[in-house]
Amino acid sequence: MRQLIACFGLSALLLTSVYADGYLWLSGAGEFPARIFRYNLRTGQIDRVVAPGEWGFVQSRDYNLLAYDGNDLYVGLENDRTLLKLNPYTGAFRSAFAYQMCNCFYGHHWMKDGTIRDGEIWRAAPGHNSSSPGILHVSTLAGSPTSAFYGMNRPDLQPIGLEWVGDALLITTASGLHRVNFPDEPLVFGAVEYALSGVPSGHVLGGLAYDPAGDALYLASADGNGATLWRVQLNHDAQTATATPVESLTLKGYPAGLQPTALGWVPARAGDANDDGCVDDADLLEVLFAFGSGC
């Protein structure tokens, strides 16, 4: 009996102190209809796959945005103004709405990665070709546009990944990592490219995500061999970025041939042993089962 009580106490302690690493949601551009994937930072596996195209809305080759506001995971389409809110842990559908703008925007620009800052959705919008300047699109959480910044005279600035890290706005293009600046000229953005080391040449850069609690910046990329997740250390003074591999995503369940154009971080809840976003009796039972054989 004493041994059983000790085992229960150990399990309860573990329940409150573990399972707090977090999750990264990834887009999967390159199939139709596309899907999104959840990478579990604790287990190192792709453990959830969600197919938004099955819900009856406009289908897309790239469901992206993947921004978390503390309650919902926001998902956007590359080719339509539809926006979705999902359960940030399970990916279950919650609601749908749309940008309050003409869908003609998508005739010349795509929408890609995004983030939420101070109650606004920031989104990377590359042109269909280099003759159209890249755009940083800003809207309210309800989808009402508030601003747009254009990479004028910078055909190299076609943003894909986008993330705020403190007061620094970072974007990726297919081949570079840049820190955005806003000159005095209205509605224009510029950028300084950081010297990125660690990512092999030939990789196409994709989404960015930031874990503020762990001060961890993540980058996803892909080449002909599959997709890779990186952790990036920034040196703003030297304008450098050093990438360290976290995982070969393709070896962990992310399909080969897809491009992770968007990345979104969601914090884990302490004690959530089964990774569903809820802390309940099922989590305690899972911990008891996992450690019961050693008691």
In which residue ranges do the predicted regions lie?
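An edge-strand/N-cap motif at the start of beta-rich repeat modules
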Residues: V18-G44, P267-A268
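Conserved beta-strand positions in repeat-built beta-propeller and related beta-rich domains
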Residues: L24-F32, V75-N79, D118, R123-S131, ...
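Structural motif
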Residues: F32-R38, R81-K85, N129-H137, G176-N181, ...
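Short loop/turn segments immediately following beta-strands, especially the blade-tip
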Residues: Y39-T43, L86-G91, V138-G143, V180-V188, ...
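Beta-propeller fold detector
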Residues: I46-E54, F93-M101, P145-N153, L187-G198, ...
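Repeated scaffold domains used in trafficking and secretory/extracellular systems
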Residues: G56-G70, C102-R117, P155-V165, S201-Y210, ...
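Blade-level signature of beta-propeller repeat domains, shared across WD40, Kelch, NHL, RCC1
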Residues: N225-T228, T240-A268
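Alpha-helical segments with a strong preference for the paired helices of cellulosomal dockerin domains
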Residues: A273-C295
